[in-house]
Amino acid sequence: MAPHNCDRELIDLIHNFFLRSTLLICSSKLNKNQHLLEEIQKFDSDLNEKPDLPKTINEWFHDENERNLPPLVIETLLDLKKLSPNHFVTLRDDDGNVWNVCKGTKKSEIVLERWLIELDNTSAAFQSYRGTIDSTGEIRKQIVLLARYLVTLIQILPSNELEENLTKNSTNLILSLKRKVIDGSKPILSKGRIGLSKPIISTYSNVINERNIPPHLEQRKITPVYTPLGLLRISVSFRHDCRFEVNQSTDSSDNVASNTTNIHQHLEPLHNKNYTNTSLSISPHSHIALASSSERNSIGKKDLNSKPIHPFKTGSVGSCTINQSQAMIRTTSNPSVIATLRAQRSRNDSISCQSQLEDIQLESTSVGSGSKYSSSFGRIRRHSSVKSSENVEKPIRLVKQSNAPTDDLLDFVKMMDEKQELRITKCNISSNNADISNSILRFQKLKSSNEILSEDLSMSVSLEGVNASMHRRSSVSHSPIPSVSPPVQYPSIPSRLSKTNLQEQDTFKTAVVSRRNSVEKSKINISQPKTTGRIENELVDKPLFNEEHESKGEELLASGIIGPSFKRSTSPHSIESVSSLISKTKIAFQQPSYYSHPTTAAVPAYAKLHRPSVLSTDVLSEDQNKKVVQDLNNNKDEDDELLFFMSDMNLSKI
């Protein structure tokens, strides 16, 4: 910090710095005095003689503010107080584009520059300064150098160019530059004026500035001068663009504006009138929008050569006339009448719209494009898109026919109201539609049964040839598994086979073949109750191993009908697959037609059971096994009657 016993000469030098800098900034080009620079250079002269200072800067030279001088702010302003309401201010940028600033009397001034002169004794730069303390003479030399740099900076600022242009152009004397000295320790207000921080050109709002300065501004700083009391600083912030212009509105433009206003005022009642006329067709269910008979007649007799103003260019609403039949339709409350004449009303609208196509061609695009949409709320125009392309060779005759009173049409409406058979027809149609839908549903339900039957037939055909090979393999290996083809859902099979009755065996063959070739018969027979049969063969009692397992295996062979929920995905070569064929109802297994009746012999049975290499557990799902086990438990009582022992059978071919 500066010592207390600071020289008085240093304080006077600092005061003189504030004074001379303020005079340099506030001096204009017209009244530029060369003695200002001379006074700055002669700081070593007698400083005791102070000039008369204005009141705005006199407070910086009091004795109590010798060491703590407040910041001094000088603003360069564009004065707009002389402008009238007919003037408006514009700004031209570097590219020659003109931007509107404000109208006269709206703003009083525009801030162009802001200078800051201060004695900085609190900044870190001053606190950390460790240089040698210069004498008062050295400080004076540095201030003179600073003053020269200040003069150069003032001459290159944009406001200097603006001031020269205003002095050359005598018509712009209403604009002038002025300077204002403000105490920097107090807040600066911009009420009633365009402040320095407000951009006029909107393109600057998209510019990114890394210096934390508004993009429409620039800042310049002069190298400070160090003194024991603080740093003497001068800085300035100014606008890029200062080419302001004043324009005055001419009488011709005022006349054009007044004429435009009169035209808008004249067109408003016309538009309102057209909107009231079109409200008749926009709201078909309203009663207050109906016009009187005289107005309807005047609309019907309107000259076709006249060019009315239509709010809708396509002519679908505004240009269509409304006849008496439409008005009577809206007043009536019978829904059948409205439904009958809705198509007729649409045809009348499209015919009357076509009569004015010649007038609308100059100001409309195409009728077809606008006719896709409804011209009123609550009803659909089904014929407008078709009628718009009809021939328009005789528009006058069509308009007269549409506007003429239609007594025959009213009589036809009354006749249609008296007929009550029309409503019965709708009921018949609805009942027929219901029958058709029910038939379709029934047909769709039959699809699943058809798929099941086709699977049964295909499996029976594919597995029939496997029976012989399976039987031969079982006889050689002494396996208790009999050769049997997978059962098919046949309705009724002879339940008793006798050696003496060969005729029944032939009948069985015929039934099997007929069931394979007929799909419709199998559908009917599936729904019929299935009969159960029991094979009564003469068996020889022999001691067998695993009696319980053999009884279950033979029970599977005895069951011939499978439940409807069963899906044939099992392997025909697996013994586990046979267990899944058990159902509540049981029939005798099918005997191959090319084998003779089975005969029994006293042959000892072997306990060794040959299992197939391929297990069906990989194929069957758990849900199917659960269903089979549940059926076994439920039918335990019935299964006891069908248990029998099976030994090897020697079958001879026919």
UniProtKB/Swiss-Prot annotation:
Function: Activates the ATG1 kinase in a nutritional condition dependent manner through the TOR pathway, leading to autophagy. Also involved in cytoplasm to vacuole transport (Cvt) and more specifically in Cvt vesicle formation. Seems to play a role in the switching machinery regulating the conversion between the Cvt pathway and autophagy. Finally, ATG13 is also required for glycogen storage during stationary phase.
Protein name per Swiss-Prot or TrEMBL: Autophagy-related protein 13
Coiled-coil blocks: none
Organismal lineage: Eukaryota, Fungi, Dikarya, Ascomycota, Saccharomycotina
Subcellular location, record wording: Cytoplasm; Preautophagosomal structure
Superkingdom per UniProt: Eukaryota
Family, as annotated: Belongs to the ATG13 family. Fungi subfamily.
A biological process term (GO) from this entry: protein localization to phagophore assembly site
GN (gene name): ATG13
Subunit composition and interactions: Interacts with ATG1 to form the ATG1-ATG13 kinase complex.
GO MF assignments: armadillo repeat domain binding; lipid binding; protein kinase regulator activity
Gene Ontology cellular component terms for the protein in this record: Atg1/ULK1 kinase complex; cytosol; PAS complex; phagophore assembly site; vacuole-isolation membrane contact site
Keyword Lyase attached: no
Primary localization: cytoplasm
Keyword terms of this UniProt record: Autophagy, Cytoplasm, Protein transport, Transport
